[in-house]
Amino acid sequence: SEIRTKGRKSEVKYQKIKNVEKPLSKIIFGCAIPVMIQGEDADELLDEVYAQGITTFDTAENYGLSEASLGHWLKNRGNREKVVIISKGCHPYDGRDRVTPENLKHDIEQSFERLGTDYIDIYLMHRDDPKVEPGPMVEILNEYHKAGRIGAFGGSNWTHQRIAEANQYAGEHGLIPFTVSSPNFGLCDQIGDPWGGGPGCVTISGPSNAEARAWYRDNQIPVLAYSSLGRGMFAGIVKSDDIEGAKKILDPNAVKGYCYPENFERLARAEQLAKEKDCTVPQIALAWILNQDFEVFPLVSAKKASRIASNAKALDIVLAKEEVEWLD
């Protein structure tokens, strides 16, 4: 069910998903930004984001002090019951995979402490380790769900095949399955692994991942799409005719993941359509995500709330099926 409320600048839309009591804002604010990673006071920025109607915030155990920064805001504003919190655990450290029951419990408990909350609306396993049976992790996530400590749960950077494996275990043991997933997805295809090391990042972007997208559509599992603007490549700061300039502007991870000819061609098409529709490139890129035939919530980060306000206008852009196909 979709709910709409008038935001200050644009009409923000909200969507209910399974096992989460509150509706999610269709655009999610990503808290892996310098001010929050460093644990500084981000209250003013978060106030402005919230004022735009964005009520869903994505953080993680390994985003430095991001959880503590978000928790500081929640405590000061007393608005925990009005927002949806997504957090993640089991990220590898120093090349050591951490997809184990012990690490999962440790990271969940640490997130509660840092966030200053006794429950997390959506909990994700940040990375996967395909050598590990998913069953024990499914058991632990169910324990926390049953205790009312986490709502929906799933994987970030888990392939759809591994999610299916986890859900088969859940089905065979009368347990709740993964009902949400957070891979990379966007018009900017993640061709390289931005971070590398260990079990890699999972994307469902680009022509080679049509099967994965069909699986999400058929299984009706919502996607929380990280790096939805290609870590800045489709944020309006890079021009399609200046590849060398892009490599200077974007961070090394973005260059490694996204700076490929195919994406500059997509960027040129997005620039053209943005001009025709009198809007911005990031608005077109986000509208492309929001106009897909499966349920997807783009994650967007920004150091300034004005950029988030501008990006939120993507919610008002309707793209024809032909435009969606042409952009890609």
Q: Where do the PLM segments sit?
A:
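N-terminal binding-site loop/beta-alpha segment at the start of enzyme catalytic domains
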Residues: 3-84, 146
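Short, well-ordered coil/turn segments that N-cap beta-strands
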Residues: 22-27, 53-55, 79-83, 117-121, ...
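Conserved beta-strand positions
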Residues: 29, 59, 87, 122-125, ...
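Active-site mouth loops of central-metabolism enzymes
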Residues: 30-40, 89-103, 131
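Short, acidic/polar
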Residues: 37-49, 99-114, 164-168
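A short, structured active-site edge motif that brings together acidic residues
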Residues: 81-94, 181-185
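Active-site groove signature of glycoside hydrolases
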Residues: 112-133
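Beta/alpha (TIM)-barrel catalytic core signal, keyed to glycine-rich beta->alpha loops juxtaposed to Asp/Glu
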Residues: 132-328
